[in-house]
Amino acid sequence: MKRFFSIILLLTFLFMGNTSFAYDESRLPTREDYNKLVEEGVLGESVTYEQFYELQKESLELEEQLGDDWEKITITRANASSYRILGGDIFVTNGTISAGLIGHAGIAINSEEILSTRKGKTPKTESLQYWINNYANSSEKVWLNVYRYKYSTDALKAARWAERTYKGKSARYRIDGDFSTTSYTYCSKIVWQAYRYGIPKTDIGYPPKAAGLYAPISPLKLSHYINPTSLAKAFR
C-alpha cells in the first residue's frame, strides 16, 4: 500500500513539474517584426533578436499564469471606488498597449494617479478608472492585476522617484536594457527603475544578460523582480 501511494505521489509531482500554459505561437515575433521595431526606433539596437524572442515567449507564458491569479483574491469588475490606491502600487495588464511588448505596466505615484508611457508618447498619468475601463475585460480575456510592495514607506519612496523623474518629462519611448538612463524609457522600465533607484539599499533583481547587455523587462514579470510584493487586487 505504501508503495502504491509513493507511486501516486511521484506521478503527481511529475505532472505538476511538466505543467505549462498554452499560448498562441503565432504571436511570437519574427525577424521581420524585430527589424521593423528597430527601424522605427521602438526597440533599441542593443537588444538582439534572440533576447526579444525569449522576452516575448516568456511573456506569453506568464500571460496565462498571471491571468489565473484571480483565484487567489477577490475578483472585481466594478468602478475605482472598490479599491484604494497606495503610492507605489504596481499595475500590470496583458492588454498589448506598449508597442513591442506584451502587456503594459504603471506605478501609482499617489492615491489618484498611475504613471506610465507608451509608443509615440511621453510619460503621463491616468486614473484607476481609466485603467479599469481600458485594461480589464473578461469577455476578451484582458485582465488587470495590482501588486503591492510589502513595505509601504519604501513603496512611497519609489512612487516619489517615479513622479520626480518622469511626470511631465519628455523621455522618449524606447525598449532596451539600458536602465541607467532616463532620457528614453518604456512602461515596465519606469516601474523597475522607481524601485531600484528610489529605495536606498534595495535588492531589486535584474533581467538576464547576453553579450554583457541586459534584456528588456517584461511588464508581466515585474512582480518577479520587485520583491517582496503580493497581489492586492485583480480586475477582470
Regions found by a protein language model. Name each.
Residues 110, 163-167, 192-200:
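Sec-exported extracytoplasmic/periplasmic mature domains
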Residues 154-162, 183, 187-190:
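Stable alpha-helical elements in mature extracytoplasmic
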Residues 155-175:
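Internal catalytic-core helix/loop-beta-alpha segment
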Residues 1-23:
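Sec-dependent N-terminal signal peptides of Gram-positive bacterial secreted proteins and lipoproteins
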Residues 19-79:
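N-terminal propeptides/leader regions of secreted preproproteins
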Residues 128-152, 157, 214-229, 233-236:
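Intrinsically disordered, low-complexity, charged/polar segments
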Residues 83-148, 172-182:
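Glycine-rich catalytic cores of cysteine/serine-nucleophile enzymes that process amide/ester linkages
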Residues 28, 178-236:
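Activation targets extended, charge/polar-rich intrinsically disordered C-terminal tails
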